[in-house]
Structure formats: C-alpha cells, structure tokens
Amino acid sequence: MHWAKILGVGIGAAALLGLGIILGHFAIPKATEPLASSVSDSQDLDLAILDSVMGQLDASRIRENLRELSKEPHVATSARDEALVQLLLGRWKDSASGLDTAKTYEYTVLLSFPSTEQPNSVEVVGPNGTVFHSFQPFEKNLTGEQAEPNVLQPYAAYAPPGTPKGPLVYANRGSEDDFKKLEAEGINLKGTIALTRYGSVGRGAKAINAARHGVVGVLVYTDPGDINDGKSLPNETFPNSWGLPPSGVERGSYYEYFGDPLTPYLPAHPVSFRLDPHNISGFPPIPTQPIGFEDAKNLLCNLNGTSAPDSWQGALGCEYKLGPGFEPNGNFPAGSEVKVSVYNRLELRNSSNVLGIIQGAVEPDRYVIYGNHRDSWVHGAVDPSSGTAVLLEISRVLGTLLKKGTWRPRRSIIFASWGAEEFGLIGSTEFTEEFLSKLQERTVTYINVDISVFSNATLRAQGTPPVQSVIFSATKEISAPGSSGLSIYDNWIRYTNRSSPVYGLVPSMGTLGAGSDYASFIHFLGITSMDLAYTYDRSKTSARIYPTYHTAFDTFDYVEKFLDPGFSSHQAVARTAGSVLLRLSDSLFLPLNVSDYSETLQSFLQAAQENLGALLESHNISLGPLVTAVEKFKAAAAALNQHILTLQKSSPDPLQVRMVNDQLMLLERAFLNPRAFPEERYYSHVLWAPNTASVATFPGLANAYARAQEINSGAEAWAEVERQLSIAVMALEGAAATLQPVTDL
C-alpha cells in the first residue's frame, strides 16, 4: 500500500493561487493542456458522467483481469508480485485509458518466509524418537494449481524457528481464558504443545497467550464447524463445493501489529532507524505452525484426558478431549509426543506500492484515495485479486474518459496498489508514515476494496458514520445482481438491517477494525474511511470467512464456479465503489453527513450510562460532562448540516464551499489523541480503538472500567477510568468545535 507525489496544474493559475492550491508531492506532472473545457469553481457531480461510468463497467473485463492477476502465486516481493507491479504501471500509463501519472514507491521491509531447504514439519514421535505420523507439508494437489513450484508451504509468518516437543493439549481458540480453563482443570501446561483452532483471538495472540502459560509450541487449524458448516469429507468440499478441503491450511501473519516490524512510526527507507531484531515486540514467542483439519483430526480424535466443554467441541466426528497426551488405546503408542519443527527465516526485502493519479481540476490538493493490496499468500483469486480486478476496471473506465477529454474530477483521485499487506498491512502503513502530514491535511476519504466478493448475496459495507449517506445514495441507484429487480440498497436491507431513530429501517454498516489497509488511515491519521465488498447470506452459513481463505485453493476456478459465476457481483461492487468514488471526487459539497456520528455517540453514551453509570457514581465519577459533550456535538453537527442546506440553495462563494468541505473532511481528525492509548501502537482514534470489554461504548473508557473492576484494583485503576472519560469528553468537544462556524473560537 503506497502513495506518491503530486505536482501543480495548469488551469487558471489565478484561481488556483486564490485557493492556495498546489497538489504537492504525489507525482502528478505539470499539465501542458487545458484540463477540461467545462471546468469551473462551481463544478459539481455530473449525473450523465456517472451514468456513463456505471454503464461502461464491464463484468467480462473484470473476469479477464482476475484470470490474469491470479494465474500464478504472487506472495509479496516475489517475481510474480513484481510482474504485477509492471502490469499496473502499464495499465495506468496506457495511451487510451491511462491516468495522468503512475509511479512506484519502494520500502525495505522485514518479511518472514519458510525455509525452502528444510520444510517445516509436525510429527508424532515415540519416547525413543520413532516417528509414528508425519503431517502433510503441503496441501493436496486437487486441481493442478496446488503443485505449482511457487506455492509457499503453509506456515505462520514471523513465528520463530525451533523444534519443541511435548505432550499435546487442546486449547480451543487459544485465548487467555482458554489456557486458564486448562489450568483450572489441573493440567500442567509447562512443556506442552497446544493445538488451537482459528477464531476468537488473533493468530499471534494464540502463541503469546500459550507461552505465558509455559507452552513450548502451538499448532493452529481451521475446524470444519467454523468454516464448512460441519462438512469435512472430500466429496463435500472443494473442488466439489466451496468448502475447505481437509488438507487446506490457512496461512497468515502472526505479527501482532501492523507496518514494518523494524521501523514503527517511520517509513522503511534505507536511512531510517531500525530496531534490533531482538527488540521487536509482537512476534510469536514460540514456534507455531498451521495445519489442515485432516491432520488435526488425527491428533484430536486420539487425545487423552477429560472431555472438552461443549463450547470447545467441533465437527471432526469425535469427542474433543483436553489431553495431555494420547489415549492408551488410540493410534499412537503410550508416551507419544508431538514435535513441531519450524525453520522460518526473517529477510529484508524491497516491496513496492504503485500509485495511479488523476489530477483534480478545481481542488487538486484534495485527495480521494482508492486502495487495494496486490500481494497474496498463494494465487489469491479472492484475496486480494478480486479487489484488484475491480480497481483496474474502474481506473480503465475513468482513464478512458480522461483521455477523451470529456471528464476530469473536481478533486484528485489516487488509485493505490499496496504491497506486503498480508504480512501486516505493510505497504499502506509505510506510506501513511512517510506522508503523514500531507495526507492528514489533504485527504478527503479512503475507500478500501480488498476482497471485493466473498460471495454473491448482498453488499457488505464498513466505515465511519459520515460515509453512510454516500454509500446509501450510491446503492439506491444501482441494480442488484440477479433478477429480483431490486436496487443494491433494497437487496442489502433484506439481509442485514437496523432501526435508526432518524431514518427508520436502514441497512446495517459495520465498523472498521484493523483487518485491511484502511487501518492506518482511520486509526493513525484519522481519515474518514470505508471498506466495500459483496458477501454471503449469513442465515445460510456460519462460515467466519469464505472457506479457502489464505489457502492454495483460492483460485480463479474457485471464484468462477462457486462465488460469482458471471461476475455480476464483481460488477456490482465496481459500480458501488465507482459511484461512491465519483460522488466524493466530483460533488461540490462533500457528501459526508456528520450528523450520522450523532447516532453513534448517543448509542455509546447510553451504553455507558446503563452499564457503567452506577459503579462510576460509587467512585465519585460522573458521566455528566460526557452527556454535555455529546449534546454539544449533536447541536454543532445539526447546525452545520443546516448551513450546508442554506448554501446549496444559493450560489455560494468558492471559499465558503471550501471552508465547509474542510470542516467535513477534518472532523475525523478531531477524534485523534496520540497519547490516549500508549499500549496500542498506531491506535489514536478515541472512538474506534480496540474495545476488549463487553460494553459497546467509548473504547478507552470501557477498557479502563473493565480493568478497574478486577479483583484488587486500586485507586490508580479508577484514576485511569477518569482519565479515559476526560479523553472522550475532550475529543467530543474538539469535534464539536471543528463543526462550529470557523469564526467561533
């Protein structure tokens, strides 16, 4: 994920100087021709252009993009990954459909790879070292693609090398509570190997939690009950259905943070300070290896010990037990242990981001950024190439209009292809670190389309509250795939909805965690962000994600046969993302509704009052200032909306428009406090930092309150609750001040 430089424009220097606009540092060349014949300061969204773009977005072209992008494995920094860099550059420099400029930006980052000379292994060994069972080092070759030479062995990226051996225990999801449960059952975890399943806590957290309790090695598998609705037989899974085959193994980064591990808060350039590798935090402390559920079954169905709790049971066709060790009448002799051999190595590699830029005609120094990562663990047809295929089609259509001279956006559009996302959002994070000030000053919104199609039932949108209105407006005008005759909006509301006190029944939008490249934009820079995709009907499957996620079975044929035959859902995402992009880049007034934050804040406040209020009161901590701050924000947001409506009915001065748009753009930054969560790297957003408590309220307040409730917590813990309450109050007051008339101080 990465970005570049921007230069000036050549359309009326006086007007540009009057607005104080230069595009700056992102590689837009100086214009040698007029940008567009019809450009004016009052340029607004052209509905005819919008309709034209919607009509030109072609499902068959998206299909061909995906076929090309996913035909070979392209892990970050591989030869194929670099070939795709050149493909993107070629498309964005094309004489008929290219953009104003395209450029690469390179960072030297620390990645983790399995050894090619000594593959990782998992074995069941007897007391004398006899190997009774060896696990599959690679997934089974079911369609030919799994045996290609560049398919990486399944591994846990950033797990340390080592060859621990010990009796096996089953630790469910590998949470802290899970390990405490095992100890409460009288199981001595020191020197054991823990078998865990994906879900509940992050990959790396499983190993961190395990090591804290004396475990020396960790195995991780995907249970068919979590991904296949219980189906586990070969004839029930890929290539016969969308289900994960028994040998399928989910790869992934086990690094707990995001960005280059050696250069936190600094771009990974050769001259940047780097940590000593021994001082890196966030890596798994013990050897860890993912395995398929076929191999996990051999372990779980032979374990000794007491039965696991009902909530720990899965779908492998046997009763899960806790261990330690194997049952005496099972497949393995008494005293057999599990040996985990990990030979991963750390390497410094050069990873590229690619930026394609369309220079804005009126406000070139205001950026609407559309990003998708390029790298995958194997072929990556779904993750991420479904998103890259859509990105290339949107940029082709807009580039064609640009080259014909019939359109140029009001604001600059930046298309970004991020590198090394799978290792921890590295490309996008390095980019935001390098251009922090510029991006905070100039970026209107960040649109992320990582996986564009999980499946073909309905839209899934995540984002901060101000983007709700522009997504709703776009989806009401686009037909949903299929023959229902519904709009994407009306189809969406059938699958997932909520009751809004303002709007009534509306589609449900999710919030943004740190699962893709929007993370550094929203949490670190405070840039209004969203993520768009099509997904499955959750009433028909309990799968936590599409089943072949991060495996060698995520291929073009998998997409075409099981996820989106005809590619109409890909086209629907292209139209949705393209419409949102145009509305944000071309509308005179930014289509961001700050009042939609009022609902969120009121909900947070109500949760705090109902769940925290009584105990806070007993510690002489009042929520009164928070109530006042929420009301102040709501009033300021409503007043700004009314001011915008008034301006829209008149012929506003360009500077009036600019001032209002800056208020809309900068609102999200007002919620940043870099000192609020010192234990959370990159998390500065007071409303969207990780909430580890059970109460859906202001995360800092919720987390501090939960810690203060713990046994033996003292005055210091309650002082932190007061501090977090003050942080929330001041963030809301600062946000309200941002929305008030600019002359009010």
Swiss-Prot record:
The gene is Naaladl1. This is Aminopeptidase NAALADL1. It is found in: Apical cell membrane. It is a single-pass type II membrane protein. Detected on apical villi on the brush border membrane of ileum enterocytes (at protein level). Mainly expressed in the distal small intestine. The chain crosses the membrane at residues 7-28. GO terms for cellular component: apical plasma membrane; membrane. Zn(2+) 1 binds at residues 373, 383, 450. Keywords: Aminopeptidase, Calcium, Cell membrane, Disulfide bond, Glycoprotein, Hydrolase, Membrane, Metal-binding, Metalloprotease, Protease, Signal-anchor, Transmembrane, Transmembrane helix, Zinc.
